[in-house]
């Protein structure tokens, strides 16, 4: 690859990179031997230790992408991930410590998802962004949607709900639509039970909550807030009725 195509960077697409430590270390050694930078996509937070991350970093690893899925322990348990939110923080903190970029992937729309669990995920993303010192929009995080596939519990659940047909032609039609399509919103089948308008809003809610949490933790808007208070305070002092112009209602659950 290097000699014929001048390749200098390798992206590894794996289901669980690092679960076989011997294999992962050998891959890192080989890529380092050929002076290649690399990025492993598809890493489980409990499959890498702080020492592993350092080992990979020292051998040319520029990024590790963890399947975070959710910042809500409730949803992680529904997914049967068998790890905790703290486990995810530990892995990402290791990446931050060793200067390894870590884009994260989350998933919305699982059975049991609601505004509270979505907000928890948004807070999680905002916390990570705060640790890195960058706004969430620069994290390169992916928002996926729960997509049932044959042979999975999610598929069986969809059949039980009646949102996935059991006849052969129904299955063929569904698989034709989602084959190689990715877990994106336009292919989402509502397994949640909440109104679809509410479900689709969750994508915006998780982004809003991530941004709100980031600003709260970093207090980046403090200076602007103080200037705003001085300006609006002067206007209101001259004419108190102007304060009504900017009245806003809080969003509540």
Model-identified regions with their sequence ranges:
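Generic recognition of well-ordered alpha-helical segments
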Residues: 91-94, 124, 144-145
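Short, hinge-like loop/turn segments at secondary-structure boundaries
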Residues: 56-58, 83, 121-123, 159-162
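A structural motif corresponding to the C-terminal end of an alpha-helix
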Residues: 4-5, 34, 91-102, 128-136, ...
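Flexible glycine/acidic-rich beta-alpha junction loops that bind and position SAM and/or redox cofactors
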Residues: 22, 74, 78, 108-116, ...
């Amino acid at each position: 690859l290097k000699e014929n195509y001048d390749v200098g960077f390798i992206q590894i697409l794996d289901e669980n990179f690092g679960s076989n430590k011997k294999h992962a270390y050998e891959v890192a050694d080989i890529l380092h031997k050929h002076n290649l930078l690399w990025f492993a996509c598809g890493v489980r937070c409990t499959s890498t230790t702080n020492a592993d991350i350092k080992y990979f970093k020292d051998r040319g690893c520029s990024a590790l992408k963890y399947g975070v899925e959710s910042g809500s322990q409730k949803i992680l348990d529904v997914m049967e991930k068998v790890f905790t939110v703290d486990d995810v923080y530990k892995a990402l903190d290791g990446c931050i410590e060793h200067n390894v970029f870590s884009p994260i992937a989350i998933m919305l729309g699982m059975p049991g998802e609601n505004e509270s669990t979505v907000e928890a995920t948004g807070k999680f993303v905002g916390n990570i962004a705060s640790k890195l010192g960058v706004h969430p929009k620069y994290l390169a995080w992916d928002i996926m949607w729960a997509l049932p596939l044959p042979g999975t519990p999610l598929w069986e659940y969809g059949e039980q709900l009646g949102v996935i047909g059991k006849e052969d032609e129904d299955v063929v039609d569904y698989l034709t639509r989602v084959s190689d399509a990715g877990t994106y919103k336009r292919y989402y089948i509502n397994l949640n039970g909440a109104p679809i308008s509410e479900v689709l809003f969750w994508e915006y809610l998780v982004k809003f909550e991530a941004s709100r949490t980031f600003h709260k933790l970093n207090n980046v808007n403090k200076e602007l807030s103080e200037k705003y208070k001085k300006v609006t305070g002067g206007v209101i002092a001259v004419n108190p009725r102007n304060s009504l112009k900017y009245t806003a209602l809080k969003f509540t659950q």
